[in-house]
Amino acid sequence: MSSITANSLSKTYGSIKAVDGIDLNVRSGQVFGFLGPNGAGKSTTIKLLTTLIPPTSGQLSILGIDAVKKPLRVRNRIGVVLQQPSYEPTLSVEKSLDKYGMMWNVPQKIRKKRVEELLEEFNLKEIRHKKNDDLSIGQRRRVQVAREFMHDMELLFLDEPTVGLDPTTRRKLLDFLKNKAKSGLTIFYTTHVLSEAEYICDEIAIINKGKIIAVDSPDDLKNRFGREKTIKIHLSGIDKSISDLLNNIDDCKIDFNSGTNITIHSDKSETVLLQILQILNNNNIPIEDLSAIPTNLEEIFLQMVEYSDASNN
């Protein structure tokens, strides 16, 4: 079953196509990453999917509801954490959570239980009586994410939810979200931290200049588009004559990090590595260690955006 289905969805402002005929299919219970550079159309897409703005053209179904014709029905079943902080400055953390539950008509007994659970889960107990205006950026962000779990929802939109969080708190939040997805919650997740997307997302779409340029799982994106490989070799020693021989190998870039370490970058890594090993063996240079560095999502993202930009010029 799909939580989000978009067909030829577009949003135009005058002559500018902010979102240009995109298709999306987000399955229920998955964490779906939505990545793109600044100005790519991410924010406009989120506003379309959360019914904050209507599309210029195209079809949009959210949780099986026609979101263009029945936006209020959609809003009653989703949660949204936008990038801009939203809070009442004079309310305490505890009262912020409780009031948000009241807005969603959550009964008092259930609200009280959920407040305590979320204060514990998001490490907010020690600041429960602190006013929102006195919180740090990271603390406000935690409150903003936590309060969405005061009500029952089937689909959650998160726009840069880890801004201002330290690494430990960030990982704890990501694990919490992954567990929620395993319980059936669908999460639409945007971030500029590509390692986050690689860790949490089941599937990823990359948008650039209003168009979707790739959709796949993180692993499949790396397998499909990860052309260049990086190999590190630790040697017992290397002199200039050997480095000159290595520099003459085609189809690669070699960095000599010190007298004993070299890093090879190549999209023909197997062929290049054989040539390097032959040179080292012929000159009796022992290899202390050899390791391949896997392609990461950030490299794929940059490569695809660069290719997309070049294709549009």
Regions found by a protein language model. Give the residues of each.
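ABC transporter nucleotide-binding domains
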Residues: 4-6, 11-208, 214
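A short linear hydrophobic-aromatic micro-motif
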Residues: 123, 251-255, 286-291
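A generic structural signal for secondary-structure junctions
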Residues: 79, 96, 105, 123, ...
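ABC-family P-loop ATPase nucleotide-binding domain
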Residues: 1-10, 307-313
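ABC transporter nucleotide-binding domain
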Residues: 175-267
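Short beta->alpha junction loops/turns
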Residues: 67, 236-238, 269, 293-294
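C-terminal coupling/interaction segments
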Residues: 268-313
